[in-house]
Amino acid sequence: MRFIKVFLFVLTGIILPVCLSAQTVSGKLIDENSQPLPYANVVLLSLPDSVFVSGTISSEDGTFTLEATSVNQIVKISSIGYKTVCKAVSPVNLGIVQLVSDAQMLGEVVVEGNLPVTRMKGDAMVTSVENSVLSKVGSANDVLTKIPGITKKQDAFEVFGKGTPLIYINGRKLHDLSELEQLNSDDIKSVEVIRNPGSRYDATVKAVVRIQTVKRQGDGFGFNLRSSYYQSDNTDLIEQANFNYRHNNLDIFGSVYYNQMESWQDFTLQLEERGTKVWNHDMKSYGEFYSKMLSGNIGFNYQLNDNHAFGMKYKSGKTLNERNPLSKETNINVDNVFYDNIKVHSCDNYYYDPDHELNAYYNGQLGEVNVDFNADYLQNGKSSNSLFQEISQTSENRDVHSVNNVKNRLVAGKLTLSIPLGGGTFAIGSEVTYTHRNDDYINEENYVPASYSKIEELNATGYAEYNRSFPWGDWSLGLRYEHVKFDYYEDGRHIDEQSRTFDNFFPNISFSTQLGKVQAQLSYTAKTQRPTYSELSNNVFYSDRFTLQKGNPTLRPTIIHDLTLSGAWRFLQMSLSYSQTKDWILNWGELVNEDASLTMLSQRNWDKSIPMFTAFLSASPKIGCWAPMMSVGMQKQWLTIDYFKESKNLDNPIFTASFNNTWELPLGFMLGLDSYIQSAGATQNIYSEKPNGYVNVSVRKSFLNDALSVELRGNDILKTNRMSYSMYSGDYYLYQKSVWDRQEFAVTVRYKFNTAKSKYKGTGAGDSQKSRM
């Protein structure tokens, strides 16, 4: 609390003097189609000698603010492809400023595939995609794999040293990563990576990826089609169709998406539990996964005038068929003496309710106040029926039937107000989210007791942020307050000891500057990581006759303090981070019986603060038709745990390296060769035993002036994308080695006609709670 008081005192000391002495020049930039114009250069010059006083860049919504120290000054506004505009600083509110195209300048712009430029802008590393080689690599999925600092692991992306990011497209938060496959790379304008998000974002968010799309011109109807065929040991299919109709200020859009996926996993597992006896399990397992999913969305955006826009988007989807058959055989020894051999055949069948997701937004300018409001509703549910058939060599056989029903509902609203203040921008906002979850588990044979649980959570947030540019750098200060009320019910009864209330403050501060051609930023943030709703469930799940699984309703949120230094120079980007993590949530195995014959897998908070250091360096030069992107990274933690009554140090660093290459060739051909490798090392109480990685190759050919494209791709051609790791936890040890059918050949055909990207500006609310579902 003392730190919070000092922080507020410093914040007041910075804001108050500038409010008393400065006049704020503000305005909003638009293009010829009345669309906001971001990234334009806005500089304040003194008269009559035109000496530079201060400068800034217009934000995503086209707004800008500057501090004028005299009426004898002018504002100069410039952007590539537009005529430069100069305005007097009187009146200080310049209102709407429209920039018109400069035909001569546009004629000189090279629009062939050039090197994607990564620069630092505010709190983000921004990579330009439009008119670069990245615009031709396929989908947004393919683009993100080539962005410095982003790595794709299995079916998710990670920002190095920060974990899984929130991903936004035009300010709208992604809840389904399949949308990245639906977004064509040539529709992307830029990708921004924020490694230390400020108070505007939920305190659980440790990294953000913002994708901005190209704003298409003109009215009319457009569509784009995509069909993909993937052949590994199984066959996967993706079919999609997007449409857009635009007339004057009305924009109507929608899409239909179908995904059919089959896969397998072959893994070996070794378990050891030590109680009064020592149990060893050697398991070989083979599992398959089948899924078919159909989804669609429709929405509209209406631009009332230059200052007001509103819209709505509805999305629905349903998994048509999903099942997971599994076969495994386990040899069990007790004190090095044979105990049993058990063969298991199981199958999980999943039945999904249709998902419903609705977002409505309003974005407007009321005088000098920018208003951004979002409201969200989300509903989903699923039921799983599981059958385990256990055949024992020395004990009784078992048939185990279980049913798990889960239903989620969420309502959220978010409001942000931004105003010019003291030569900078002051933003204040609030977000309220209500979540309701039912989770029932029933075991017909009563090997584990039936449970009927309910979770209700109210998250109320207030935040404030101040940004100001000086000739020597940019400051940003913010503070976020979060009130979380968590109520847990079991069998219809409120469980007081597992229901809690949290009140936390999360400050952030950052400073950005430019020294010659070097851009640098130093930032501090306080973050949290809340347990998922399944981790909070007290339901007990049957894994086998020796192992049960459940959540832990007593879990506390993790608190993270992070200090990050980022820099950029020409084609080089660098990041250094140091963090302290308190109450880290670890997967943990505990003995139920003293003789270790039964183990419960759950989660726990680590009661000591864990320090971590990460370093990252990337380079993206251009050599003729060759555009390489090379990166190296290191992550090291300092963690010691109790393991089999002894201390186990898990401080081995993890090293990563990637080398992505793109060659642009004549006749519309483009070649790609991407590789990634990760060393052995420790993360939390898990140690990766062996290096793993992949090599992907691709060739793309465009036709009909790029309206039609065909891509051939080979993924994991060396079949090295596999995993082997150990988990250490008290009296329980697990080793797993997994192989997937990720080596595959793919063909993708895309066709587009008069495409126009949606102008939808909804950003969503309750994002972190949606992710926890």
Q: Where does each model-flagged region fall?
A:
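Short, acidic, small-residue-rich periplasmic hinge/interaction motif at the N-terminus
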Residues: V43-L45, S78-Y82, L94-V133, K153-Q154, ...
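Outer-membrane beta-barrel signature, preferentially recognizing the C-terminal barrel domain
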Residues: C347, K454-E457, E497-R500, T528-K582, ...
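N-terminal periplasmic accessory domains that precede
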Residues: V92-Q98, E108, A140-V143, L177-S178, ...
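Surface-exposed extracellular loop regions of Gram-negative outer-membrane beta-barrel proteins
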Residues: Q212-S227, D266, D282, L294-I298, G381, K485-Y488, G516-L563, L576-S597, ...
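Face-selective signature of the C-terminal outer-membrane beta-barrel domain
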Residues: S295-N321, I342, S346-D491, Q514, ...
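Short, acidic Ser/Thr/Gly-rich low-complexity loop/linker segments typical of extracellular
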Residues: P48-T63
